[in-house]
């Protein structure tokens, strides 16, 4: 189990004349899931990339428990702590096993690598497609391979950009169950999605991004599924 607790404050970024994020605050904790909602271009992906240390904001501070520092000073630590998964994860040439091997430490012995890959295949339910070419996988299968690669890296924070877009129901359920498993293991999750209702069983905090501002809704404060859906209807467009 991890003991991750990171607080982002006063995050702001502008692209040209558009203020994408302004005064954004975000608290990330082990074993909890934040769901980011908002229209295209609202800043969901930008915020994920800032958390991952991949996109520098114009302003902002990070507190990892040892003090409040400028984002730029914490950039390397964020990159070491978080794994960011793109909406369309890249697959390397070769089969699924080869793709999983890319996530392993090069110092591992051959037996250790085999054991770790086999564990990942079993954990993600990929045994039946282990020898398949990764380039030919369906969208749902690719996403599960990407999550398994992330699992092999032991992330403290996993950031997912639209992870279930264009998936059939079976693939959605499999993917969300993997995320539930990660959350139960203590991984902090931050997910962006246009389909927030599918993440009801996973979400602890629902954040709506609009006009550069983030509005929060804590789903664990005695909130029933009816309240969750009511909030989606009223606030998530």
Feature locations, PLM:
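Helix-to-loop junction immediately C-terminal to a conserved catalytic motif
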Residues: 52
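ABC ATPase NBD Q-loop/coupling interface
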Residues: 61-77
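Conserved catalytic motifs of ABC-family nucleotide-binding domains
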Residues: 88-98, 108
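Conserved ABC ATPase "signature" region
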Residues: 111-129
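Conserved ABC ATPase signature
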Residues: 133-137, 141
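Catalytic Walker B motif of ABC-type/P-loop ATPase nucleotide-binding domains
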Residues: 158-161
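H-loop/switch region of ABC-family ATPase nucleotide-binding domains
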Residues: 193-194
